[in-house]
Amino acid sequence: MKRRKFSSVVAAVLIFALIFSLFSPGTKAAAAGAIDQAAALENGKEQTGAMKEPEQVKWYKVTPGATDIQKNSHMALTVKSDSVLNVSVYPSKEKALKDETFEMYRSFTAEDGKSEVIFPYAWSGPYYVKVEYLGEEEPEDGGTAEAAAEAKYTIGYKGTKKQPSDLEEEEACPVEMSVDQKKSGKGILDKLRSIRDEQLSQTAEGKELTSLYYKAAPFIVAKLALNKTARNEIYQDLVTLKPLFDDVSENGASSSYKVTEKDQKAINRLYDKALQSVPSFLKEEIKKQADRLNMKQLQGKTAGAILTENNIAAKSEVQTTKVIFKVKDNKSLSSVHNEMKGFSASAQSKKDISNVKKAKKLFDNLYSFELPKDEKQNGAYTASAKRVKSAAATLSKMSNVEFAEPVQEYKSLANDIQYPYQWPLKNNGENGGVKNADVKYEPANTLLSKRKLNDTLIAVVDTGVDSTLADLKGKVRTDLGHNFVGRNNNAMDDQGHGTHVAGIIAAQSDNGYSMTGLNAKAKIIPVKVLDSAGSGDTEQIALGIKYAADKGAKVINLSLGGGYSRVLEFALKYAADKNVLIAAASGNDGENALSYPASSKYVMSVGATNRMDMTADFSNYGKGLDISAPGSDIPSLVPNGNVTYMSGTSMATPYAAAAAGLLFAQNPKLKRTEVEDMLKKTADDISFESVDGGEEELYDDYGDPIEIPKTPGVDWHSGYGRLNVMKAVSAADLQLKVNKLESTQTAVRGSAKEGTLIEVMNGKKKLGSAKAGKDNAFKVNIATQKQDQVLYLKATKGDAKTSYKVVVVKGKPSGTPKVNAVKTKDTAVKGKANSKAMIRVKNKSKKVIASAKADAKGTFSVKIKKQKAGTVLYVTAVDTDKKESKEAKVVVEK
């Protein structure tokens, strides 16, 4: 039989017409007896098989060994046959019996009679493979179908290592078409996938429709692949239905779009073509469902009403694409815009970079802008990845631009074996990053591996967590989980966001699978408050926070945001009062304002950094930002078993939450405020000042400039700095506590483990050092420091090494200096005052006649001319805050 090249977009469009024909058909389950007889497949060994009847199924299972898992990240399963065979791979027997798997793990024998599924080693196995015979194609001339022949095939798999860049995205549309058709086809394909993945997958009816899609697709595309006229007709209908697809994808069951007469005719034509393409047994199944709903009488109905009848409701998420660029030092954004006027580039590139004049200033000379919308597509954003890359390349060639590159909100890539790609744990400086700009996971892990730690409960209040993945097995407390969306105890993730967050926190290390989480002692409480589209109301979230606190969580991760709510604020206070540390994402708007609940006083707000150790372009910043952590291109687990790159403060927050959990694991008696303070005071300073002196300008609602407030030791964009886990856990290990240091004090005091070496630094200059004694107390003598001076206290003992930020606060004014007796023969006024105080000697008229600084111990000697007996002098001390003491009156003696 001649095989034909297929188009997934054509199949998807045709099958979408069947959405309206679905009427509670009931999900078909696999026969338990058949799956129990599944044949075992071995790595590198092929097997043969044969089936005689349509809809016949053969089962196989794969149980990868430890060596295979450590060596390979995926298996490449191949089925070869001249017949039409559907192939599905499942992560477990339970999933196989329910026919639940991801689209990328379904395939069918194509043009060359070969089907390949790349499946990740992300579950503990065994994995199950279903091979299904679908019968033969209907003849194109309408004649009698060929008698079903025996379907012979070969099946086998090989282990393979897929690096992140090796993962392939779904094929857009291999069918031959014009450029305009490719654009339309790709755009509509994205909408249809959104409808299928975010809406149909949520109901039994939707799953049955999807199952029907996989059965019918091979036959539909085979009919159309070689028929150009039919394809053109399909695309005309596709364009007709585009507004319907757009509205349903965006609004789900809330769609108010009414099916028009033109829509109805397009649906009818698509439906008829589908019926003409499939074998008899599928044709009857499709017709039965269409007749039940009277599919050809949909005109005038709203899409939302039709979807509601079928229990399908979800909302997709729209994404944008940006370019980020840095203007060279001593240059400005206007200089780039002026250079563009005479710059040689293609018309498309010039159009794409035209929005540079509207670029948003992130900080210093770093800017971002969005490519202009394509007006030909009704204002829809259609810029391709190729166009974005080209725009960045064009900017990079300009003399006033230091660099430019595309900024992507998330990027799907591949899957311990993927540890080299976890730059937040170990940044090697690759892909434009800065070496060692990471959270210092490896030295922290080395230190903690020698210590006895307690398990710590961390609640992920999110979309749920997929606990079936091997890297999260035993890490998720499903017995403590709850679903506030479905109002049950099944907190399984149906969106992916919560699993990604949980992987960052607690994925098992050194087990060969997938990736490494930051906190080996974390146990995740999955609390589902967001639905399959990633949205939820304040009441659900508030209840989730309270629930997590009541279940014993020491840390709550809130990678979500929205408007202020008194209900939510109450829940935050409730948890804080129970000594729960709450980490909340600062927001992804790139604005000078924190989102809520990050702006609440009851949480630790977390911003995001990138590989270059700078605040990420999307990260909200400003007043109240506590700390930053890696949040750009962060790899972690998603429910389909792969490790996926995502960007956002949602990804930065779990690093801070995991680090907080480690401190509680070291000492469960710590207060949440102590943990937060330790994380902030040990963070790495990543702030920098503009070389050309330019500063970010802020404006109020009336357009008047606002002065950026200055807080010593805190950066406007990154808070206290980028998370440093090694310093934080070392501080906890050393039991380090530092007393407040006032500008009038001459010693830094605190406590630490006996023998801990304490050094006080002002930049690279050491001001003093001492060791903690048997009573754990330390005192480091230093000269008095000015108010707001930022010092760093280095503490070291064994493997534990930390640097703790100390900001000098305003001290009490200097006391009246103690002055020695002054005689007529003396040429100096001597005495004691505060360390480094400026001593002023005044005459009877209170005019300063001499001055000098006291030394580090407060001893002073101010040179004066010899005075007559009975002369009255006044002596004062001016401290580092420039506060002058009361006068000490001295009468010169003989």
From Swiss-Prot:
Q: Which residues form the Peptidase S8 domain?
A: 422-729
Gene induction: In stationary phase.
One Pfam entry for this protein is Big_6
Gene Ontology CC terms: extracellular region
Signal peptide (UniProt feature, chain positions): 1-31
Q: What happens when the gene is disrupted?
A: Cells lacking this gene have no discernible phenotype with respect to sporulation, motility or growth. Significantly increased amounts of BglS, Epr, Vpr, YclQ and YwsB; decreased amounts of AbnA, PorE, Csn, YncM, Yxal and YweA are detected in the extracellular proteome.
Report the subcellular localization.
Answer: Secreted, Cell wall
Q: Which InterPro entries match?
A: Big_6, Ig-like_fold, Peptidase_S8/S53_dom, Peptidase_S8/S53_dom_sf, Peptidase_S8/S53_subtilisin, Peptidase_S8_His-AS, Peptidase_S8_Ser-AS, Peptidase_S8_subtilisin-rel
Q: Which gene encodes it?
A: wprA
Q: Which residues cross the membrane?
A: none
Spell out the catalytic residues.
D462, H497, S650
Kindly report, in one word, the top-level EC class recorded for this enzyme.
Answer: hydrolase
Can you tell me which family this protein belongs to?
Belongs to the peptidase S8 family.
Q: Which GO terms describe its molecular function?
A: serine-type endopeptidase activity
Q: What does this protein do?
A: CWBP52 is a serine-type protease that could be involved in proteoglycan peptide bridges.
Q: Which UniProt keywords apply?
A: Cell wall, Cell wall biogenesis/degradation, Hydrolase, Protease, Secreted, Serine protease, Signal, Zymogen
User: How is this protein's activity controlled?
Assistant: Inhibited by PMSF.
At the top level, the lineage of the source is: Bacteria
**Does Ubl conjugation count among this protein's keywords?**
no
Q: What happens to this protein after translation, modification-wise?
A: Proteolytically cleaved to yield CWBP23 and CWBP52.
Biological process GO annotation list? cell wall organization; proteolysis
What is the protein name for this chain? Answer: Cell wall-associated protease
Q: What is its EC number?
A: 3.4.21.-
